[in-house]
UniProtKB/Swiss-Prot annotation:
One of its GO terms (biological process) is xanthine metabolic process. Pathway: Purine metabolism; XMP biosynthesis via salvage pathway; XMP from xanthine: step 1/1. Xanthine binds at L20, N27, K156. 5-phospho-alpha-D-ribose 1-diphosphate binds at A128, N129, G130, Q131, A132. This is Xanthine phosphoribosyltransferase. It catalyses: XMP + diphosphate = xanthine + 5-phospho-alpha-D-ribose 1-diphosphate. Its EC number is 2.4.2.22. Keywords: Cytoplasm, Glycosyltransferase, Purine salvage, Transferase. InterPro entries: PRibTrfase_dom (IPR000836), PRTase-like (IPR029057), Pur/Pyrimidine_PRTase (IPR050118), Xanthine_PRibTrfase (IPR010079). The gene is xpt. Belongs to the purine/pyrimidine phosphoribosyltransferase family. Xpt subfamily. It comes from the Bacteria. Converts the preformed base xanthine, a product of nucleic acid breakdown, to xanthosine 5'-monophosphate (XMP), so it can be reused for RNA or DNA synthesis. Homodimer.
Length: 191
C-alpha cells in the first residue's frame, strides 16, 4: 500500500536492524486518515470471504481493525492482555510472546462474542515472529470459528512470521512488507 509505505519512509524511525518505530502514526499517535485508508484496503482484500467478526489484540491493532470493521460492517473484538474486573469468566485464553517488548502475556476474549458460526479476520499492526497472530488464531479455534485470513499493517518479512502462518495454511495480507532495516534504511519487498 503506497500511502502506508510513504508514511513509513517519512515518519518511521529505524531503531535497529530488527525494530521499526511507527509511534508517529500507528501505535502511539494515530493518523485517522491513514487508518481509514488501511481499513478500506483490508476491506477490499477480504470483501468476498463472508467475514462476520474481526479479532485483534490490544492496543495497536485496534485502530486498523475498527476501520476495517467499519468498512465491512462487522463487529471488532480485541483480545485483552490482562485480566480486567469486568472480564472474569467464560474466557478463551492464550499465551503470546511480544517480540518488541520481550515479554509473554496471557490474552483473553469472552466466549460471548465469538462462536462456531463466525468467520473471523485477524488484524494486527505488526507481523514479526507470528506469535501474536498465532495466539489470536488459538482463541478463535477455541470458539470453533473459521479464520478467513490474517491482515497485517506492517510485516517484517525478514522475520519468520509470514512463513509460519502460510505453512499452517492461513491467508496473509500485509499492507507494507519490510524486507530490511539494515543500516537504518527501510527497504520494502517488491511485489
Amino acid at each position: 500500500m503506497y500511502a502506508l509505505e510513504q508514511k513509513i519512509l517519512n515518519e518511521g524511525i529505524v531503531l535497529s536492524d530488527q525494530v521499526l518505530k511507527v509511534d508517529a502514526f500507528l501505535n502511539h499517535q494515530i493518523d485517522p486518515v491513514l487508518m481509514q485508508q488501511i481499513g478500506k484496503e483490508f476491506a477490499a482484500r477480504f470483501k468476498d470471504t463472508g467475514i462476520t467478526k474481526i479479532v485483534t489484540i490490544e492496543a495497536s491493532g485496534i485502530a486498523p481493525a475498527v476501520m476495517a470493521g467499519l468498512e465491512l460492517g462487522v463487529p471488532v473484538i480485541f483480545a485483552r492482555k490482562y485480566q480486567s474486573l469486568t472480564l472474569k469468566d467464560d474466557l478463551y485464553r492464550s499465551k503470546v510472546f511480544s517480540f518488541t517488548k520481550q515479554v509473554e502475556s496471557t490474552i483473553a476474549i469472552s466466549n460471548k462474542h465469538i462462536n462456531a458460526e463466525d468467520k473471523v479476520l485477524v488484524i494486527d499492526d505488526f507481523l514479526a515472529n507470528g506469535q501474536a497472530a498465532l495466539g489470536l488464531i488459538d482463541l478463535i479455534h477455541q470458539a470453533n470459528a473459521d479464520i478467513v485470513g490474517v491482515g497485517i499493517v506492517i510485516e517484517k518479512s525478514f522475520q519468520p512470521g509470514r512463513d509460519l502462518l502460510l505453512e499452517k495454511g492461513y491467508r496473509v495480507e500485509s499492507l507494507a512488507r519490510v524486507a530490511s532495516l539494515t543500516n537504518g534504511q527501510v527497504t520494502f519487498v517488491i511485489e
